[in-house]
A protein has these predicted regions:
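Glycine- and charge-enriched low-complexity intrinsically disordered segments
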Residues: 109-117
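Extracellular C-terminal loop/segment signatures of secreted glycoproteins
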Residues: 97-98
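Glycine-rich beta-strand-centered segment in the early N-terminal region that forms part
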Residues: 24-41, 53-91, 102-109
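Short structural boundary motif marking the start of a folded domain
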Residues: 1-4, 33
Length: 117
């Protein structure tokens, strides 16, 4: 599928690691669903990721993008929330010490489809 992703990171030239091309369809963990992305926005988080902040080398290639709007598998319009908490966490996911954002541990929203909880 068509995607925009980080293939490498650079403190001095972050955009050099940005690639536009094909990536595999998202792997969908049990209990998650797939969203067909219709709109996504670039955030400063994406630039920091290309600089190597919050993104580990062993996670590359990583589809960037934290938020999106689109359609779920049933055709419902949805807005994708970027914060992913631990499955065992109860309460505000922003307070979960094991939380992450899409495009840190899980492939992000700059693609035709994204897997989300």
């Amino acid at each position: 599928m068509f995607a925009v992703y980080a293939n490498s990171m650079s403190q001095t030239d972050p955009m050099s690691g940005l690639v536009i091309g094909d990536r595999p369809e998202p792997e969908v963990p049990e209990g998650w669903t797939t969203v067909t992305v219709k709109a996504a926005s670039i955030n400063h988080h994406d630039v920091w990721s290309l600089r190597g902040v919050g993104l580990r080398q062993e996670s590359l290639p990583m589809i960037l993008g934290c938020d999106a709007a689109g359609f779920d598998e049933d055709g419902n319009e949805v807005i994708v929330h970027a914060v992913i908490s631990d499955p065992d966490w109860v309460g505000d996911e922003a307070l979960d010490p094991r939380r992450s954002l899409l495009s840190e541990r899980y492939q992000g929203t700059f693609a035709e489809r994204v897997a989300v909880p």
